[in-house]
């Protein structure tokens, strides 16, 4: 098993963890409907980059 040879300081531990934070999803506003959606994803009503690409059922 891997066992550390020397104890790591709080500073080194913090520097290692500095990249672990989660960022929020980037949101865009659809130009045709004004609806918020995730970048590079189809909106819930089926539009992508201003064009209807998916037929959404009205269940």
Swiss-Prot record:
InterPro entries, per database record: Ribosomal_bL32, Ribosomal_bL32_bact, Ribosomal_zn-bd
GO biological process per UniProt: translation
User: Per the record, where are the segments of Basic residues compositional bias?
Assistant: 7-16
Q: Which GO terms describe its cellular component?
A: large ribosomal subunit
Q: Does the keyword Cytoplasm apply?
A: no
The question of whether Ribonucleoprotein is a record keyword is answered with yes
Region Disordered, annotated ranges:
1-59
Family membership: Belongs to the bacterial ribosomal protein bL32 family.
* Record-linked HAMAP family: Ribosomal_bL32
Name the record gives this protein = Large ribosomal subunit protein bL32
Organism expressing this protein natively: Hahella chejuensis (strain KCTC 2396)
Which gene produces this protein? rpmF
């Amino acid at each position: 098993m891997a066992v550390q040879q020397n104890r790591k300081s709080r500073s080194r531990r913090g520097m290692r963890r500095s990249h672990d934070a989660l960022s929020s999803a980037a949101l865009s506003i659809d130009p045709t409907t004004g609806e918020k959606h995730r970048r590079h994803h189809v909106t819930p009503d089926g539009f992508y980059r201003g064009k209807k690409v998916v037929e959404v059922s009205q269940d």
